Amino acid sequence: MIEDNKENKENKDHSSERGRVTLIFSLENEVGGLIKVLKIFQENHVSLLHIESRKSKQRNSEFEIFVDCDISREQLNDIFPLLKSHATVLSVDSPDQLTAKEDVMETVPWFPKKISDLDFCANRVLLYGSELDADHPGFKDNVYRRRRKYFAELAMNYKHGDPIPKIEFTEEEIKTWGTIFRELNKLYPTHACREYLRNLPLLSKYCGYREDNIPQLEDVSNFLKERTGFSIRPVAGYLSPRDFLSGLAFRVFHCTQYVRHSSDPLYTPEPDTCHELLGHVPLLAEPSFAQFSQEIGLASLGASEETVQKLATCYFFTVEFGLCKQDGQLRVFGAGLLSSISELKHALSGHAKVKPFDPKIACKQECLITSFQDVYFVSESFEDAKEKMREFAKTVKRPFGLKYNPYTQSVQVLRDTKSITSAMNELRYDLDVISDALARVTRWPSV
C-alpha cells in the first residue's frame, strides 16, 4: 500500500509539472480552421501567452500558427493528439521535464480514444451539402441543392450527446422513400437473410418504418442502443474510410439524413437515408453483425493508410455487398444490395460471379460504385466472417493492442505490462462470473 501511494504521488507530481511551451503548426486556409484549434486549448484550460500567424513557406494553401502557452505535462499529452487531428504540428519547443520521450506511438496516425473524440473527425466530409457532381441527378435542381445544404448544416453542427434533429420531410421526399420501400419489400422475403427479416418488423413497430413515413434518426438510434449498443450520428456526406471506420469502433454509425433526388428513386450515386435505413439499420440491430462491424472499426484505429484501405475494402464486400448461406441457399446481408432493387436481383440471379469470403483476397478486389460488382463474396455465417476478419486483423501492424470499454465508451491502449494486467483482471472477473453460472446450472439443472 505504501509503495502504491508513493507511486501515485510520483505520477501525480510528474503529470502536474508545468512550463512554457512553444508550438508551431500549419493549417489549411479554410473558414473556421483556427477557431477549432484554439477551442482545443480552451477546452483543456491551457493559458495562451502569445499567438501569431504567418503564410506558410512550403504551401500557399496553408498558414502557420505560432502559439506560446503555459501548460502542464498532462495537458500537453491531452491536446497533442487532438491538435494532430486538425493541424500538422511542425515544432514543439518545451522544457526537458515536459517533453515526453520519443517512442513508436509518435509514428501512429491520430485516432479517437473516446466516443466524444468523433466530434473531431465526423465533419471531415469529402463532399459538402450542395456540392454535387455534374452527373448527379440533382445537379441542376436549385431547390434540391438548398435542401441538401440544410441537411449538411444540421450534421455539421451536431455534437456528441446532442439529440438528432427531427426532420419534417417534404411530400416529394416521402413519395421517393415510399417507392423504394414498396419495391424492396417485394424482394426481401426471397432475397434477404433471416436476421434482416427478423429485425425489419421490429423497426416497423418501434421506429415507424412505413411506406408513407420516413423514420427519424433519433428514434432509430434509441432503438439500436437498446438492441446492440449502436447509435446513429448524422453526417453531411462521404467520410474518408479512416473516419468512417473509427465510428464503428465505438458502435457509432455515421448516417445521412437527406433523400436521393426524386427524378430517379431507384438510383443514387451516393448513400442517402433510404440506403442507411433500409440497408444498414436492420442488421445493426443484430448482435452478431454489430460485433462484426465494431471489430472492423477497432482494427482500423491507428493503422497505416494501406491497412485502413484493406479493411475498408473488406467492409465493402461484406457489410455493403456481402452474401451468406442459409438453408442451402444464398441470401443477402450487404446494405448496398438490400437498398438497390436491380443489384439485389442480379446478385442472386445465378449469373453473378461469387467466391468464398477470404479477407486476403477480398481486400485486393476493386470496389465499383456506379455499376454492379464484378464479384460477390459469400460467408458461411456472420460468425464465420467475424472469425476470418479476426485472423486478418492480427496481421495489422500496430505497436499496441486495443480493448473497448463499453461502460466509458472508450478504447484502452494496451502497450505495457500495467495496461495489459488491468485488462487481464477485468477478463478474470468476467470468467469468474461465467464459471459461477455454470456451476449453479450444474447444481440446479431444473432452475
Curated annotation (Swiss-Prot):
Residues the entry annotates as binding Fe cation: 275, 280, 320
Pathway(s) annotated for this protein in UniProt: Aromatic compound metabolism; serotonin biosynthesis; serotonin from L-tryptophan: step 1/2
InterPro entries for the chain: ACT-like_dom_sf, ACT_dom, ArAA_hydroxylase, ArAA_hydroxylase_Fe/CU_BS, ArAA_hydroxylase_sf, Aro-AA_hydroxylase_C_sf, Aromatic-AA_hydroxylase_C, Trp_5_mOase
CDD domains associated with the record: eu_TrpOH
Protein encoded by which gene: Tph1
UniProt keyword annotations, A-Z: Iron, Metal-binding, Monooxygenase, Oxidoreductase, Phosphoprotein, Serotonin biosynthesis, Ubl conjugation
Name used for this protein in its record: Tryptophan 5-hydroxylase 1
Disulfide bridge map: none
Entry's Gene Ontology cellular component terms: cytoplasm
Mod. after translation: Ubiquitinated, leading to its degradation by the proteasome. Ubiquitinated is triggered by phosphorylation. Phosphorylated; triggering degradation by the proteasome.
Residues the record lists as binding L-tryptophan: 238, 260, 268, 339, 369
Organism: Mus musculus
Knockout mutant characteristics: Mice display impaired hemostasis, resulting in a reduced risk of thrombosis and thromboembolism, although the ultrastructure of the platelets is not affected. Blood platelet counts are normal. Defects are caused by inability to inability to mediate protein serotonylation of small GTPases during activation and aggregation of platelets.
